[in-house]
C-alpha cells in the first residue's frame, strides 16, 4: 500500500466517466469518491453512457475535466470514436485518459491519445483504479 500525504485543497477534481454499464459506473464512482474523500479532496464525477452525451457536455471555452475514464465498448459510437474526437481539439487532447475495458489490447501505445493507463475491467481492484487516477493526475494521495 502506498502512503503519500496530501494537503487538502478546495479545488474540485472533475472526471468524465464514459461507461454504459450502470453497475460498473456506480461502482467506479462510489469507490473513487470514497478514496478522494479520505484524502480530503473534492471530486466530481460526471457519468455518461455514450460518446455523444459526453462530447455534448464538454464545456465550450470553460475549464475542461481533469481526466477521462473510458470504456471502449459503448452503445453507439465506441470509445475510439471519442478518443479521435477529443484528439482533434488542442485543449482536450492534453487531458489524460484511462481506458477501463474487458477487451484485451495489443501491445501498442495509445500515447497519441494521451492514454496513460489501460485497466482490465473484470480483474482490477478499487485500489488499482484509484492508483491509476492518482498517477494520471500527477498527484500524491494515500492509496
Segments predicted by a language model, with ranges:
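Active-site residues of response regulator receiver
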Residues: 70-72
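Short amphipathic alpha-helix used as the core "switch/output" element in two-component signaling
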Residues: 56, 80-93
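Acidic, metal-coordinating helix/loop segments flanking the phosphotransfer/catalytic sites
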Residues: 45-67, 128
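Alpha4 helix (beta4-alpha4-beta5 surface) of REC/receiver domains from two-component response regulators
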Residues: 81, 102-131, 135
